[in-house]
């Protein structure tokens, strides 16, 4: 095999996310249209509730050019709809799922337009108004011997938004990214990084520049959530959220209680006493969440220049987005699907339409060198999800048959003699319980387990090349202990394989989009992929060990 495999995966997530995907809990989630006719009705309803000039109001925040600009213009002129998705900044564009989300939105927009005749365009919401530098400061790459975490330091004190956070020294991380790319067939992704992550820019600015350069040729527009035109369009809605802060708080409390009563855990913890609106000084600085007790007073001041810039929190943002964009659907990750159960309590409390969330497409990329390692070592992917499992099995396999037999015989002899002592003790009249023998045997078993671990460790040290290959495969498939899609950076894959990667991702995303529009369970590509792997090996399903990462916005 000389080309990578792009494999569709089940999305996974919490029990609440899976309930959303399965169409359960209709009291918390708007129903996903189940046919082309239903999507047509959904699109027409969104058209009817959206203004004709929506694009003019936020055009500067999109600044779309090329194929993305042309598609947006066509949709606006035809009173069409948009399919949105988004993500907070991540170093060098963040993990693979940034692309999974963007290409899912593209595929769904294409499918909705083809099925309904309503013009549709994908829009990626770059959440540069987010202040989580810890999330924005890292990415991961797969290298020989494992995965490497790349980080940058903050260029200013923490607390400010990523649009305002100066980019620190990125040179070491960029050098590591280049090394991870290895032999490349497409230099463009690296050239885009070099142009975007330049001295004097911000974390959010670099992220925005990179995504626009890479997404716009596909027709995907990238919206800067921190742009002044978004703040202007959202301000009346943010003031309404402040004016009704108590009503919103009550609605969220009731929904939180209902979710818990149904046996689920809310994705976003309730913070009593705080509204869903942030404020920061107009000249930059830290964001603060406005207390409910201050909310009405802030709302009453309206557009006073004495007040700072307002922005929504994670539960209010989807409601704002749906109000300022003709959003027919938001393509969501599992964490987002979970917290949309709360979002749909916020919207009616504000007298606004609830946004519709649909599950994104999910993938694992298997490069040829990883497939060769799995094949040559006889590894199952699921073994790599657990630390030391594959290493231990292969190390035991590498032990001499005589040593393995001797260990097994020793365990058997200990058990046999312990049983004999226990039987003899029972037959005697000594005032000593047999539990003493049981305790002694457990102590001996523990010692034997330690001995075996030390022997296995010695075998691992001898099998250095094999252990390195295992670490390489694990770093490629379960980097830093999580699923590949949630940690590894996309750019090395693109640099090594060119358009093959994105072409195959689009193919997978289109199959997923066709299922979303038709909603026939028999055509669900994620379920089909899972069933196929389970049929081939009941223990080797890569998705079985639900290892999740610290990535929070899509987690």
Feature names for model-found ranges:
Residues 1-64:
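N-terminal leader/transition segments
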Residues 78-113, 332:
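N-terminal catalytic cores of NTP/NDP-binding nucleotidyl/phosphoryl-transfer enzymes
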Residues 265-328, 332-345, 367, 555:
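A translation/RNA-centric and nucleic-acid-associated enzymatic feature enriched
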Residues 93-95, 109-134, 355:
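Glycine-rich phosphate/pyrophosphate-binding loops
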Residues 137-140, 365-397:
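A structural-propensity feature for long, helix-poor, extended segments
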Residues 96-97, 132-139, 234-238:
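Short acidic, glycine/serine/threonine-rich loops at helix termini
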Residues 140-169:
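A glycine-rich helix N-cap at a beta->alpha junction
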Residues 37, 210-302, 397-555:
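Long, compositionally biased intrinsically disordered regions
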């Amino acid at each position: 095999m000389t080309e990578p495999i792009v494999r569709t995966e089940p999305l996974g997530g919490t029990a609440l996310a899976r309930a959303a995907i399965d169409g359960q809990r209709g009291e918390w989630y708007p129903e996903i249209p189940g046919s082309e006719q239903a999507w047509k009705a959904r699109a027409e309803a969104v058209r009817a509730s959206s203004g004709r000039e929506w694009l003019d109001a936020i055009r500067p925040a999109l600044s779309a050019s090329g194929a993305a600009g042309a598609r947006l213009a066509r949709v606006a002129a035809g009173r069409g709809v948009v399919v949105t998705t988004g993500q907070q900044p991540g170093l060098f564009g963040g993990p693979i799922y940034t692309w999974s989300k963007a290409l899912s939105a593209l595929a769904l927009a294409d499918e909705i337009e083809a099925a309904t005749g309503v013009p549709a365009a994908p829009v990626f919401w770059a959440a540069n108004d987010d202040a989580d530098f810890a999330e924005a400061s890292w990415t991961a790459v797969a290298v020989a011997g494992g995965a490497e975490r790349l980080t940058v330091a903050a260029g200013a004190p923490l607390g400010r938004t990523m649009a305002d956070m100066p980019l620190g020294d990125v040179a070491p991380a960029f050098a590591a990214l280049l090394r991870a790319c290895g032999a490349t067939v497409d230099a463009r992704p690296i050239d885009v990084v070099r142009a975007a992550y330049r001295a004097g820019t911000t974390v959010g600015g670099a992220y925005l520049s990179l995504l626009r350069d890479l997404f716009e040729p596909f027709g995907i527009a990238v919206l800067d959530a921190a742009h002044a035109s978004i703040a202007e369009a959202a301000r009346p809605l943010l003031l309404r959220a402040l004016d009704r802060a108590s009503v919103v708080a009550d609605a969220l409390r009731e929904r939180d209680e209902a979710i818990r009563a149904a046996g689920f855990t809310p994705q976003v913890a309730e913070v009593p006493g705080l509204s869903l609106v942030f404020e920061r000084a107009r000249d930059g600085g830290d964001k603060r969440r406005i207390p409910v007790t201050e909310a009405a007073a802030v709302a009453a001041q309206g557009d006073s220049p004495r007040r700072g810039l307002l922005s929504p929190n994670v539960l209010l943002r989807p409601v704002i987005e749906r109000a300022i964009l003709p959003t027919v659907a938001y393509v969501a990750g599992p964490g987002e699907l979970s917290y949309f159960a709360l979002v749909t309590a916020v919207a009616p409390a504000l007298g606004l339409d609830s946004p519709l969330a649909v599950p994104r497409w999910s993938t694992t990329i298997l490069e040829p060198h990883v497939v060769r390692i799995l094949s040559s070592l006889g590894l199952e992917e699921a073994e790599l999800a657990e630390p030391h499992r594959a290493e231990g099995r292969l190390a035991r396999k590498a032990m001499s048959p005589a040593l393995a037999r001797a260990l097994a015989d020793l365990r058997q002899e200990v058990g046999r003699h312990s049983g004999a002592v226990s039987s003899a003790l029972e037959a005697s009249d000594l005032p000593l319980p047999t539990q003493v023998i049981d305790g002694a045997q457990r102590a001996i078993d523990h010692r034997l387990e330690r001995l075996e671990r030390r022997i296995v460790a010695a075998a691992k040290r001898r099998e250095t090349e094999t252990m390195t290959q295992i670490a390489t495969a694990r770093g490629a498939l379960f980097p830093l202990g999580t699923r590949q899609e949630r940690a590894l950076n996309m750019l090395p894959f693109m640099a090594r394989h060119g358009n093959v990667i994105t072409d195959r991702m689009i193919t997978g995303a289109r199959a997923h989009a066709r299922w979303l529009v038709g909603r026939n369970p028999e055509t669900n590509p994620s379920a089909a992929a899972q069933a196929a792997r389970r049929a081939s090996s009941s223990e080797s399903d890569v998705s079985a060990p639900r290892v999740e990462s610290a990535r929070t916005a899509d987690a």
